[in-house]
């Protein structure tokens, strides 16, 4: 039953994303259930596809700016939970391949000595985005105020190294549809946080391809590569979840093959900010 449900959901995503190509650039909205990753651990990006801005969002008498259209096939490589001792190897692989990525960063205190790597990543043209200061579900999901306090602390800790005022993208720990947060903040905590994020001008970013590099067992580089290929399937618009934490060094080893595979399939590499607009 679980396998059948997974295939049905993936089919729905493929259909909806295919239809979405007929629309202008817009936002992914978080509404999809978990696909391809462990429940309560990882969540996919939702399946709404591209939509045009609502007429009410365009001031009367003005001509809205038209952002560049994304390529027909694009992929965003995203990395959570860094910087760490793994990050230099990830940056080396990306830079060698001339690929730009998006890093959803943490500042837990344990990785303080690696925070200067954020300046290196930003200087190389990679996108820096918010993840969490603590990444402790029991702390950040106690209440909306607790979440925003955590984000403010993250911003403060990374401010010496990157331009934090311009960061308008974030990724909720566990994804925007995680259910583990209900243990601490109640059933409606994520809906409330998503609404508040939009009100504050943030775009929350999930994913539809999971490398499964942080689900336990320390998977090999070849396993991570196969996971990415399998999860991509026939999709043509992909946000790939990977990690550059201290325990996911094999992710860096898998990157050259992952990048080459996407290139062979005709994908263009993009930063998240190039394909998903802010509210």
Where in the sequence are the language-model features?
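Intrinsically disordered, low-complexity Ser/Thr/Pro-rich tracts
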Residues: 1, 5, 37, 41-43, ...
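N-terminal Sec-pathway targeting helices
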Residues: 1-18
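Hydrophobic alpha-helical membrane-insertion segments, chiefly the h-region
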Residues: 17-28
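C-terminal domain-boundary segment and adjacent tail
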Residues: 26, 31-35, 44-46, 69, ...
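Active-site beta->alpha N-cap acidic-glycine motif
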Residues: 41-172, 275-277
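Catalytic domains of cell-wall/extracellular-matrix polysaccharide-remodeling enzymes
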Residues: 135-241, 245-261, 267-268, 274-277
């Amino acid at each position: 039953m679980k396998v059948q449900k997974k295939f049905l959901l993936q089919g729905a995503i493929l259909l909806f994303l295919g239809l979405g190509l007929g629309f202008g650039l817009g936002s992914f909205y978080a509404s999809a259930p978990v696909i391809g990753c462990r429940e309560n651990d990882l969540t996919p990006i939702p399946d709404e596809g591209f939509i045009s801005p609502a007429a009410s969002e365009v001031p009367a008498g003005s001509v809205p700016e038209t952002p560049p259209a994304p390529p027909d096939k694009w992929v965003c490589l995203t990395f959570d939970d860094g910087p760490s001792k793994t990050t230099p190897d990830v940056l080396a692989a990306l830079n060698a391949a001339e690929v730009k990525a998006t890093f959803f960063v943490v500042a837990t205190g344990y990785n303080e000595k690696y925070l200067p790597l954020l300046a290196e990543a930003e200087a190389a043209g990679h996108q820096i985005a918010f993840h969490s200061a603590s990444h402790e579900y029991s702390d950040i999901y106690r209440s909306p105020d607790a979440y925003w306090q955590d984000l403010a602390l993250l911003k403060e800790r990374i401010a010496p190294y990157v331009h934090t005022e311009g960061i308008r993208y974030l990724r909720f720990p566990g994804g925007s549809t995680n259910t583990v947060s209900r243990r601490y903040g109640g059933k409606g905590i994520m809906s409330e946080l998503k609404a508040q994020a939009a009100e504050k001008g943030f775009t929350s970013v999930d994913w539809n391809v999971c490398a499964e590099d942080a689900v336990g067992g320390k998977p090999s580089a070849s396993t991570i590569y196969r996971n990415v290929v399998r999860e991509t399937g026939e999709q043509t618009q992909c946000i790939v979840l990977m990690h550059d934490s201290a325990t996911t060094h094999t992710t860096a080893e898998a990157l050259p093959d992952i990048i080459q595979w996407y290139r062979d399939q005709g994908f263009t590499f993009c930063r998240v900010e190039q394909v998903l607009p802010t509210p």
